Structures are given as structure tokens and as C-alpha cells.
């Protein structure tokens, strides 16, 4: 019986030793797997954080760029508004010219134009109060032999200045048209003077 007890005891001891070895190896494998997974997770975490930081920087740059563009656009819009006001004020001042100044303007423009001499002079309400048939007769005398400009019965729908019309063709000398052409030519110069 003692042999059987010894044999049983040895089998149990061997089984216990094998169990310890298997558990030790399993624990070691488990630790290695966990360490690998933690290392991989840390690496992925680093990549995710770097990507998030890169995206955050790019988003911040886009927001700043958009804000700067919007500020430039607002500044440009404000400058254009000021320039438009300058030209609108110019039209208003021209419309408020004295009768003598307006007559001088009409006379100078007509005498310096290459006209056939038989055009119709179209004025707005205010212009009709300043220019009469006597002025037109004097103008025709100064034009000379081809001077046959007539004062039109038509009242122009414009702020100031005048239109010369012949056979449906108009030469637009309204203050709006003249200032508009100057705006195209002098817009940059006015901006330079105003904003430098």
C-alpha cells in the first residue's frame, strides 16, 4: 500500500508541478499579449492624437483665413461705399450749380463738341428753368452757320446736365453719365487719395 501511496503521491505532485508550469506559461503569455495590446493601443492613441492635432491646426488656419478674407471684403465694401458717396456728392453738387455755372457748362460742352448743329437740347425740370430760348439763340450764333440747336419740349428724367438728341441718337451729357465715366477712369485715384 505504501507503494501505491507513493505512486499516487508522485502522480499528484507531478500533476501539481505541470499545473504550475502550465499556469506560469499561460500567465507569461497573457502578460505578453496584454503588453503587446497596450503598446499597440498607445501607438494608435499617439496616431489619433497627432491626427486630431493636425486637423485642429488645419481647422484653426481655415477659420483664421476665412475671418481675414471676410475682414478684407468688409473693408473693401466700406471703401467702395465711401467712393460711391464721393461720386454721389459730386453729382449733387453739380446739380446745385448756379444758373450761370450751368449755362457755362452747357455752352462749353456744345461749343467743344463736333456737332451737326441741328440737335435737340433735352433738359430736366431744373435745367428748363435756367436755359431759355434766348440762351439757345445766343448759342446758335456762336456755333455759326450750322447752328440750329432747338430746345426740346421733352423733359428729361435725370438729375442734371443735358442730352443732345438727333434722329433718335443721344449724346448723353447728364451729370450722372459724366460722373459715371469719371468713376471708371478715376476710381483708383480717388481711392488712393481717400485711403492713403
From Swiss-Prot:
Q: Name one GO cellular component term.
A: proton-transporting two-sector ATPase complex, catalytic domain
Q: Which HAMAP family match?
A: ATP_synth_E_arch
The record's keywords, sorted A to Z, are:
ATP synthesis, Hydrogen ion transport, Ion transport, Transport
Q: Name one GO molecular function term.
A: proton-transporting ATPase activity, rotational mechanism
Q: What is this protein called?
A: V-type proton ATPase subunit E
Q: Supply the gene name.
A: atpE
User: What does the organism's lineage look like at the top?
Assistant: Bacteria, Bacillati, Bacillota, Clostridia, Eubacteriales
Q: Name one GO biological process term.
A: proton motive force-driven plasma membrane ATP synthesis
What is this protein's function?
Produces ATP from ADP in the presence of a proton gradient across the membrane.
Identify the species of origin.
Answer: Clostridium botulinum (strain Eklund 17B / Type B)
Family per record: Belongs to the V-ATPase E subunit family.
InterPro entries under this entry?
ATPase_V1_Esu
* Source organism superkingdom: Bacteria
Listed Pfam families: vATP-synt_E
Amino acid at each position: 500500500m505504501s507503494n501505491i501511496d507513493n505512486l499516487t503521491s508522485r502522480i499528484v505532485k507531478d500533476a501539481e508541478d505541470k499545473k504550475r508550469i502550465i499556469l506560469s506559461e499561460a500567465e507569461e503569455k497573457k502578460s505578453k499579449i496584454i503588453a503587446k495590446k497596450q503598446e499597440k493601443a498607445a501607438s494608435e492613441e499617439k496616431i489619433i492624437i497627432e491626427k486630431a492635432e493636425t486637423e485642429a491646426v488645419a481647422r484653426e488656419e481655415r477659420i483664421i483665413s476665412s475671418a481675414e478674407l471676410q475682414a478684407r471684403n468688409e473693408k473693401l465694401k466700406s471703401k467702395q461705399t465711401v467712393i460711391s458717396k464721393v461720386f454721389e456728392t459730386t453729382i449733387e453738387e453739380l446739380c446745385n450749380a448756379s444758373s450761370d455755372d450751368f449755362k457755362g457748362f452747357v455752352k462749353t460742352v456744345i461749343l467743344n463738341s463736333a456737332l451737326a448743329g441741328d440737335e435737340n437740347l433735352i433738359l430736366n425740370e431744373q435745367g428748363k428753368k435756367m436755359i431759355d430760348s434766348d440762351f439757345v439763340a445766343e448759342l446758335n450764333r456762336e456755333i455759326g452757320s450750322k447752328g440750329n440747336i432747338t430746345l426740346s419740349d421733352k423733359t428729361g428724367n435725370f438729375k442734371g446736365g443735358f442730352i443732345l438728341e438727333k434722329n433718335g441718337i443721344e449724346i448723353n451729357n447728364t451729370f450722372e453719365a459724366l460722373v459715371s465715366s469719371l468713376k471708371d477712369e478715376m476710381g483708383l485715384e480717388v481711392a488712393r487719395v481717400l485711403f492713403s
